[in-house]
Amino acid sequence: MGDIRQSLLPRDVLSAAKELLYHLDIYISNLVQSGRQPPQVDTKTLELVEEFILHAPKDRNALTRRMSALQELQLLEIMCSCFQEQSRDNVRQLMFSALFSLQGNQADDSRMALLGKLVSMAVAVSRVPILECAANWLQRTHCVYCVRLAQVLVDDYCSMMPGSVPTLQNIHSASPRFCCQFITAVTTLYDLTSEELTPPLELLQMIVSWIQEDPRLVLVTFLNTPLSGSPPSTSLDVTPLGGLVRWCVKAPLVYKRDKKQMLPHSSSGSEQEVAALFSALHLSVLQVFMLLPNILNEKGIFGRLALLQVESLASLTSDLSRLLDQADKHTHTPAADVHVHPQLALDRLAQALQVAMANGALLCSREDLRAICSRLPHNNFWDIFLRRLLQEGSDGT
């Protein structure tokens, strides 16, 4: 495709981008039809994408071509139509990869900006092919960039235009694969370490309703992922279970750190409403764990593949220990709440560990479990639970 550059240069920015998309579709269709395995887009084509769609200058002395806001909107509409009209999924996926796979160069910022706008538009107009392509992108891209994409959607649909939350909620039925990856990304983004990293109430309500309606939703990526090898450590987790457990365990303490910051992202809602949402979420997560034995046995991997990682739990217990120390120092906490919220956090962690281990989601030796739990302060209930769990696991380790 390198020979079409000269024909694109005289065109205006929108016309050039549209023409390149047309040729890119033909080029990739022919590439797939040739049967070459794996089909790979050549470097010159990627450079054309960067120059005429992402508008990264080919060299330092070249003038940077820019689109107006209207032209950019028109380009997004053209891209939506292009993916919608292409009937072959493998062509769509390869085309999406040519446009948005990160290359480790200066064009990546433009790539991410355009991707965020395209996916946000796809959510708004329910362009399922783009959401499916974005689900694959989220599965193979470094989690730092996945979180950036999730942040765009939360900002667009939960912050800047709260009334449009129902539009985002529809991704559950439009593309369960994308919805599952989105949940994993937002639980990675909002780790409850600060006010800014506490999920907005609207987002929390949406995720709870999704999982209550369909607990298997959080397993969609796992169920559709080949078991040929482990994903890179820099990728998102294969399920959002670790992030959801983190939310449920830390929530009683995080939302009590400062009553003035009870609902940092929302103008409505109450302490009781938030508590009820996290309680419902915790129950749903336990129900997901209880679905796993049949699923893992069907795949022949029960006891061989952990969906809840020991490293993630170690990080959680470290955070929880810090939060418990902070809770002890809060002088304005009502006396009745001094032990209630720490106890609730510990109870949820104990329940999650127990149910996860019993149902094959967590593969953990007694030594690992003891090391994880040693970070936590002494607590009668926790000590009893730990002794029982270690005793139950003694025959299998």
Annotate the PLM regions.
Residues M357-T397:
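Eukaryotic acidic, Ser/Thr-rich intrinsically disordered low-complexity regions
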Residues I53, L291, H330, A352-N359, ...:
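Hydrophobic alpha-helical segments
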Residues L21, L118, L346, L369, ...:
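Generic L/I/V-rich hydrophobic alpha-helical segments across diverse proteins
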Residues P38, A62, F278, G303-A306, ...:
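Polar low-complexity intrinsically disordered regions enriched in Ser/Thr and small residues
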Residues M1-S228, P232-S235, L244, L353, ...:
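Extended hydrophobic, helix-prone interaction segments
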Residues T141, R148-G163, T167-A352:
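Long alpha-helical repeat scaffolds
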